[in-house]
Amino acid sequence: MTSRRELCVIGLGLIGGSVLRAADRAGWTVWGATTSPVDAAAAAGQGCTVEPDVGSALRRAAADDALVLLAVPFTAVEDVLTSVARHAPRCRLTDVVGVKEPVAAAVRRHVVPGTRYVGSHPMAGTSASGWAAGSADLFDGAPWVVSVDGGGDRAVWADRAVWAEVAGLALDCGAHVVPATAAEHDAAAARVSHLPHLLAAVLAAVGADGGPLALALGAGSFTDGTRVAASHPELVRAMCEGNRVALVDALDDALGQLGAARAELASTGMVGSTVRAGHLARRAFDASRGGSDRGSVQVDLETPGAMERLRELGHLGARVTALHGTRCQVVL
């Protein structure tokens, strides 16, 4: 559906830097900008094109008709969108921010008519941050949500060609595409991304409260359970606080299950129900990632109802693995 292959990345930390590398690997013409002198110097030192400031990068994007990708913390989105409106007001726009509904709302407030926006979010990362933590293969095999929100609000919905371009970028970066609405993404991410950061923080603090002996005994289960607690605190705050409503719902669910486990342990001396439920849930997760072939279908983006069909399939856990012209190959 699209042959465009030019990409402007705003933000060159872990995710933005990895997108720039992966897109370059796939043959895109790429450049970026960042407010971090450290990341700018590191990227330029590896031969990447780094514009002197965000405005310069966006003006080049406007001149070259490039896709613009925002890879900044949620707290910086409003300022960057103001720059987009000033320097590239009719661009094709996406983002990789960890929350989608609040970003869409910010787009409504700041962009001018003619901006064509499709939100996205790769579900990949590490506990480290910055350009040095990124790599071209960070997204290989990872799910990458590409929003399928519709409706008449042109400030937060682009045409199918832009959706295909963003999905094509995700596929070129090595990911598979999961179609979902912004609200569906935020509800799911609260449970499988944002809540784990809070639980890891609590687990790390509880372990530390046990004193030097407890930390000396910390091994695999403690290390695995607290890995993301090593992430930059301000980045975690931006992600979690930006998804407050959905995260509170997920946290209530977790607290309810922890309360049930405590009650069972206190009254019976056992925790069988909690452990069995968690074991089965983990096995189901592993099976969903195991590559079992449940068949595939094709969805032609030019047919009526195509985006709603993709949303329905994404809701069932299906993923787009290839894009041939206007046809999406969807694995069930």
Q: Whereabouts are the PLM-identified features?
A:
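Phosphate-coordination loops involved in phosphoryl transfer and adenosine-cofactor binding
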Residues: 3-6, 90, 141
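Interdomain hinge/lid region at the active-site interface
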Residues: 213-286
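NAD(P)-dependent dehydrogenase/reductase Rossmann-like domain
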Residues: 258, 265-267, 271-332
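NAD(P)+-binding Rossmann beta1-loop-alpha1 motif at the extreme N-terminus of oxidoreductases
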Residues: 1-53, 59-62
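Rossmann-like NAD(P)-binding element
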Residues: 54-94
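Rossmann-like NAD(P)(H) cofactor-binding subdomain of soluble oxidoreductases
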Residues: 80-131
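Hydrophobic Val/Ile/Leu positions in short beta-strands of Rossmann-like dinucleotide-binding domains
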Residues: 8-9, 70, 146
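Internal alpha-helical scaffold of NAD(P)-dependent oxidoreductase catalytic cores
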Residues: 138-230
